[in-house]
Structures are given as C-alpha cells and as structure tokens.
Amino acid sequence: YPPKPETPGSNASPEDWASYQAAVRHYVNLITRQRYGXXSSPEEAVAWLLFKADPSQDIEPRLDDDNAW
C-alpha cells in the first residue's frame, strides 16, 4: 500500500487542509480500488474480500438447514 498522508498541524492553513483532504481521497481510492484476477468473476472476488472464501468452493448461501432462523 502507499504511505498514508501526514496530517497537517493544528495551526495549518486552509490550503494545507485542502491539500491533505485531496491526498486522503487519493489514498482511499488507491487502497479500495477493485482488483480482480484474470480468471475471477466479480462474485468470487467479493466472496474472497468479504469472507476469504476459497474460490473453488460454492459461493451460494446454503439453505438446507431448517433451523437457520
């Protein structure tokens, strides 16, 4: 990951704060950018990101348990 932007001091100018906010936006965009593998479907990528699921496993929810709720 890229380095986090440094927070300006408490007595920083409005221009410094605007520059910091732009740097934070850029940083967040970089670290949250979607990265899919060449053979991955978006569903597999989301399952991996959310659950660290094995892409070889079925990603559909299992509804075979009658006592789920």
UniProtKB/Swiss-Prot annotation:
Keywords: Cleavage on pair of basic residues, Hormone, Secreted. Coiled coil: none annotated. GO terms for molecular function: neuropeptide hormone activity; neuropeptide Y receptor binding. GO terms for cellular component: extracellular space. X's at positions 38 to 39 were included by homology with other pancreatic hormone type precursor sequence. GO terms for biological process: feeding behavior; neuropeptide signaling pathway. It comes from the Eukaryota. This is Pancreatic propolypeptide YG. Belongs to the NPY family.
